[in-house]
Amino acid sequence: MVKAKKQYGQNFLIDKSVLAKIIQAIPKEMNNIIEIGPGLGDLTQELLKISQVKAYEIDNDLIPILKKKFQKELECGKFNLIHQDASEAFNPSLDEKPYFLVANLPYYVASHIILKALEDKNCLGLIVMAQREMAEKFCAKEGNSEFSSLGVLSAMICERKILFDVDPQCFNPPPKVMSAVMSLIKTKDFDELCEIENFKNFLKDCFKAPRKQLLGNLKTYKAKVLEVLSTLGLKENIRPHEICVDLYLKIYDKLKDEYGRKQRDK
């Protein structure tokens, strides 16, 4: 039995019923799937029944195991195994063709990889397993205390849903937290709405103290923020988690020149 490595945040999924539910949730028309962290290949095996698969694996010790297990699929070109850290492979895309991402993500890189995938124009959407708390942040709605910059970014371009929870006992070794599988299906790209790097910097400021008032977090631009809040009919003491995506875009529109200048001056 291969031992999971802590430095890669490995927890091997061993519950076959969870694998089946993940496969069932993948949109039927997806025929080019990318998997991050195939591990021992249990999910990969099921994915190959419905699509060609390109998998990114960082662990040296798992590469020969996967090559042996999927020798036929590798030889016929249905499976492509890349020995690389996937978080460094967005260059700018994980694949030259449109793809759908499926992954059991290590908790320590989950948010980074999901955001990279959302920014990747070739990514059509993703079904990923992550820490339940992380899934809640990506799928939260305005008004919910969990609504954060991650929720704003995903809501801008995706249909979002937490599909189901996954108990620690479904893994070897069992993690110390509850996991969840979420679906993020893209409906548009960021560049249809804004300049994403500047907008992310804006959101970082908006949520730097999430329980404080938005006006306090954006005090550098207090006069402009007061003006736009008044124009939009929003109260001055509104907090970041109470504002919907459309309103964030409208507030940003009044401040985008400031954030563009900030980026250029870096």
UniProtKB/Swiss-Prot annotation:
Its cellular-component GO annotations read: cytosol
**Localization (cell):** Cytoplasm
Q: Which residues bind S-adenosyl-L-methionine?
A: 11, 13, 37, 57, 85, 104
Question: Cell division among the record's keywords?
Answer: no
User: Any idea which UniProt keywords this protein has?
Assistant: Cytoplasm, Methyltransferase, RNA-binding, rRNA processing, S-adenosyl-L-methionine, Transferase
Which CDD domains does the record associate with it? AdoMet_MTases
The chain's coiled-coil residues are none
What does it catalyze?
adenosine(1518)/adenosine(1519) in 16S rRNA + 4 S-adenosyl-L-methionine = N(6)-dimethyladenosine(1518)/N(6)-dimethyladenosine(1519) in 16S rRNA + 4 S-adenosyl-L-homocysteine + 4 H(+)
Which protein family is named in the record? Belongs to the class I-like SAM-binding methyltransferase superfamily. rRNA adenine N(6)-methyltransferase family. RsmA subfamily.
What function is annotated for this protein? Specifically dimethylates two adjacent adenosines (A1518 and A1519) in the loop of a conserved hairpin near the 3'-end of 16S rRNA in the 30S particle. May play a critical role in biogenesis of 30S subunits.
* Protein name listed in UniProt: Ribosomal RNA small subunit methyltransferase A
Q: Which organism is it from?
A: Campylobacter jejuni subsp. jejuni serotype O:2 (strain ATCC 700819 / NCTC 11168)
Q: Which gene encodes it?
A: rsmA
